[in-house]
């Protein structure tokens, strides 16, 4: 359903943001 799609997009976005933050932290 539509909510499932939103949840999937939210998880993907959160995962991407978390991955990006981890990269920034690892560079320091």
UniProtKB/Swiss-Prot annotation:
Indicate where this protein resides in the cell. Secreted
Q: For this UniProt entry, what's an example GO CC term? A: extracellular region
Coiled coil (residue ranges): none
Share an example GO biological-process annotation for this protein: defense response
Alphabetical keyword list: Amphibian defense peptide, Antimicrobial, Secreted
Question: Where is this protein primarily located?
Answer: secreted
Asked whether the keyword Secreted is assigned, the reply is: yes
Q: What does the entry state regarding organ or tissue expression?
A: Expressed by the skin glands.
Q: What does this protein do?
A: Has antimicrobial activity.
- Please report which protein family the annotation says this sequence is part of: Belongs to the frog skin active peptide (FSAP) family. Cruzioseptin subfamily.
What protein is this chain from?
Cruzioseptin-10
Q: What is the lineage of its organism?
A: Eukaryota, Metazoa, Chordata, Craniata, Vertebrata
């Amino acid at each position: 359903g539509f909510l499932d799609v939103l949840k999937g997009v939210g998880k993907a976005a959160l995962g991407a943001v978390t991955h990006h933050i981890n990269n920034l932290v690892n560079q320091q």
